[in-house]
Amino acid sequence: MYDNLKSLGINQPEDVDRYSLRQEANNDILKIYFRKDKGEFFAKSVKFKYPRQRKTVVADNAGQGYKEIHEINPNLRYVIDELDQLCQRDQVEVDLKRKILDDLRHLEGVVSHKIAEIESDLEKLTRGK
């Protein structure tokens, strides 16, 4: 699993925190950030440079003939797919944690409100005697 990342020298893909991708001239620059260890100020990162693939395609207009386009490198596409799997898995875990915490806060509010309601009813009963 994660063979493309391992081929880049990333032997522990589970340590990947996030990544960024930008284009510079005819290259795509991939920067992969790893989780910070305790006491570190900055996350470790590695940078990879992929040349964009040049393709000649038929132009839309019949009179223009052909035009050259630049596309993302196929190898980079596979690496990004693996990075997305890793990063989205982390996002799902964070979303689940947030949902559980939100549910707990809601439950806490409901229980507090119900306790106040019961105490109010008890107060009414004791005042009546």
UniProtKB/Swiss-Prot annotation:
InterPro entries: UPF0325
One matching Pfam family: DUF3461
Highest taxon of source: Bacteria
Entries under NCBIfam families matching the protein: PRK13677.1 (NF010213)
UniProt similarity note: Belongs to the UPF0325 family.
Database matches in HAMAP family: UPF0325
The protein, known as: UPF0325 protein Spro_3794
Organism, scientific name: Serratia proteamaculans (strain 568)
